[in-house]
C-alpha cells in the first residue's frame, strides 16, 4: 500500500521526537532510505540527508535542497499525563483539522518530514536531483543545522518546509540569542503566612510568530502585580518561582509562592484588583489566577530584586519593520523561570533581523540586571537570514503559485528563528524560499493542522519541482 503525505505525518506522530530526543524518528527515516534504496548520510548529532536522483531528462537541471526539522516542541496541558519521551501522540481529526489530545501536535515541523518522505517515495513526477535534509534540535539550540556537513549539500536552491501559512513565503528571518538571568539564592527560615499565586489561562504561542499578537505572559503579569504590591506597602518575599517550559514559547502559566506579614484580606483584595486590571488588558485570552494560603518554611533573601527586574524588563515587540506593515524586527520573550536549591533563573529569548539592534537590546537587559545584582549569561546565539530582493527562486515560486491558484503569493518576514539563517551564512549564494501548510497555534496544546492544506502544499511542490 502506497502511503500518502498524511499517512506519513500520522506515522511521525506515533514516534516520540521531542527536541534533543529525535533518535527514534531518525531511525525511522534512515530505515526508510534503506528500504527505498536511496543514498543517504547521518551524522553523530542525528541529522540525515537523503538523495533522490533526477528524473530522466532532468540531469542537467540544478539540484534542489528540501529541508525541515525532525524535532517538536513538547508542551502539554497541566492535567495531561502524556510522556513525550515514550508515548505516541493521541491524534484526532475534527472539522478538517488534525489535533493532539492535550499536547502539541508537532506539525512544526513534522509536516516537512512527511512531505519529503512522500516525495522521496513517489516516482510518478518529474524533478531535478533532490537533496532532502532532516535536521535535529531546531526548537532548542539549532545545533542540528550547525553540524551539517557542508559537503553533503551541492544545491544552491533551497525550499524550506518550515512555513506554517499556505500562500505565504518568508523572505527573511530573525537571528537571536538566549539570555539566562541568574540570582544566587540564599534561603532563610521563615514561618510567616505563605501563599501560592498561580497565574493561568493564557494562550501562549510561538515567541516568533505570536509575539506580534501582544499576548499576555504569565511571568510578566506576575512581576507587574507583585511589584504593585511592593509599591503599595505590602510585604512580599518569594519562596519559589516556576513558570514556562520553553524559551521560545510565550509563558502561559506560572506558580509563584511567597510569604507575607501583611493583612491577609487586604493583600488578597489588592491582588484581585490588579489581576482584574490585567484581565482587561487581554480581553481575548481566558486569563485567570488562584491565590491560596499555604505553610512554608523558607524565603529567598532579597527577592525584591527579582520582582523589580520582572516588572521593568522589556517584553514583547520592541521595534516594527519599516518595510513590512506590523511585522516585528526586534522582540524579547520571557520564556522560563525556575527555582533550584542554589539559584533563581529567568530565561529570555531575544530576536532581531538586525545584529546592531540585537546587541543594543542585550545591553539594555544586562544593564537592568546589573542594577539588581543579577548575572546575565548569553547562549545559543543564531543567525538571521537577510531579505534578497533579487531572488530568482522566489520569482519562480510566485509565478507558479499565481498560475496554480490565480492569486498572489504573499511575501512576509518572520521574527521566528529559521535554519535558513545558518544555511545562508554557510552558503551565501543559496537562493531560499519557504512554504508550508496551515499550522495554527503552534507550540501550544491547541496546535492543529488544516489537513487539506497539507495535501495542497505537497501537490503544489510536486508540480513545481517539474518546472525547476
Predicted regions and their residues:
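Acidic, glycine-rich active-site loops and adjacent beta-strand->loop/helix elements
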Residues: 70-72, 104, 133-141, 162-166, ...
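Active-site-adjacent substrate-binding region
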Residues: 217-220, 224-241, 387-430
Amino acid at each position: 500500500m502506497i502511503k500518502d503525505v498524511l499517512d506519513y505525518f500520522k506515522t511521525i506522530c506515533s514516534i516520540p521526537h521531542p527536541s534533543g530526543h529525535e533518535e527514534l524518528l531518525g531511525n525511522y527515516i534512515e530505515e526508510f532510505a534503506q528500504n527505498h534504496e536511496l543514498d543517504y548520510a547521518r551524522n553523530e548529532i542525528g541529522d540525515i540527508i537523503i538523495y533522490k536522483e533526477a528524473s530522466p531528462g532532468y540531469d542537467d537541471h540544478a539540484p534542489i535542497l528540501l529541508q525541515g526539522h525532525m524535532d517538536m516542541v513538547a508542551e502539554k496541558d497541566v492535567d495531561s499525563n502524556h510522556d513525550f519521551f515514550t508515548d505516541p501522540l493521541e491524534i484526532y481529526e475534527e472539522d478538517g483539522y488534525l489535533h493532539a489530545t492535550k499536547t502539541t501536535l508537532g506539525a512544526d515541523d513534522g509536516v516537512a518530514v512527511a512531505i519529503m518522505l512522500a516525495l522521496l517515495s513517489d516516482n510518478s513526477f518529474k524533478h531535478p536531483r533532490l537533496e532532502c535534509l532532516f535536521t535535529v534540535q531546531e526548537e532548542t539550540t539549532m545545533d542540528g543545522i550547525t553540524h551539517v556537513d557542508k559537503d553533503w549539500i551541492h544545491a544552491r536552491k533551497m525550499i524550506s518546509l518550515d512555513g506554517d501559512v499556505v500562500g505565504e513565503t518568508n523572505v527573511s528571518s530573525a537571528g537571536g540569542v538566549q539570555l539566562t538571568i541568574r540570582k544566587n539564592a540564599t534561603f532563610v527560615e521563615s514561618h510567616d503566612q505563605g501563599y501560592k499565586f498561580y497565574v493561568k489561562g493564557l494562550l501562549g504561542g510561538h515567541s516568533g510568530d505570536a509575539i506580534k499578537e501582544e499576548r499576555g505572559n504569565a511571568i510578566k503579569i506576575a512581576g507587574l502585580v507583585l511589584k504593585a504590591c511592593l509599591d503599595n506597602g505590602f510585604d512580599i518575599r518569594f519562596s519559589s518561582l516556576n513558570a514556562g517550559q520553553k524559551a521560545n514559547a510565550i509563558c502561559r502559566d506560572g506558580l509563584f509562592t511567597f510569604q507575607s506579614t501583611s493583612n491577609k484580606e487586604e493583600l488578597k483584595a489588592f491582588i484581585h484588583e490588579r489581576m482584574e486590571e490585567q484581565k482587561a488588558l487581554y480581553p481575548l485570552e481566558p486569563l485567570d489566577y488562584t491565590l491560596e494560603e499555604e505553610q512554608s518554611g523558607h524565603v529567598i533573601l532579597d527577592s525584591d530584586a527579582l520582582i523589580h527586574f520582572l516588572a521593568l524588563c522589556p517584553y514583547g515587540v520592541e521595534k516594527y519593520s519599516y518595510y513590512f506593515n506590523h511585522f516585528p524586527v526586534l522582540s524579547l520573550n520571557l520564556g522560563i523561570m525556575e527555582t533550584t536549591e542554589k539559584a533563581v533563573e529567568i530565561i529570555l529569548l531575544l530576536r532581531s533581523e538586525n545584529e546592531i539592534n540585537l546587541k543594543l537590546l542585550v545591553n539594555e537587559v544586562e544593564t537592568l540586571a546589573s542594577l539588581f545584582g543579577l548575572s546575565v549569561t548569553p547562549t545559543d546565539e543564531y543567525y538571521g537570514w537577510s531579505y534578497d530582493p533579487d531572488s530568482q527562486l522566489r520569482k519562480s515560486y510566485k509565478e507558479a503559485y499565481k498560475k496554480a491558484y490565480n492569486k498572489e503569493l504573499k511575501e512576509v518576514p518572520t521574527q521566528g528563528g529559521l535554519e535558513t539563517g545558518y544555511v545562508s551564512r554557510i552558503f551565501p549564494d543559496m537562493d531560499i524560499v519557504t512554504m508550508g501548510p496551515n499550522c495554527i497555534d503552534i507550540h501550544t496544546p491547541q496546535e492543529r493542522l488544516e489537513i487539506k492544506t497539507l495535501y495542497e502544499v505537497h501537490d503544489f511542490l510536486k508540480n513545481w519541482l517539474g518546472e525547476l
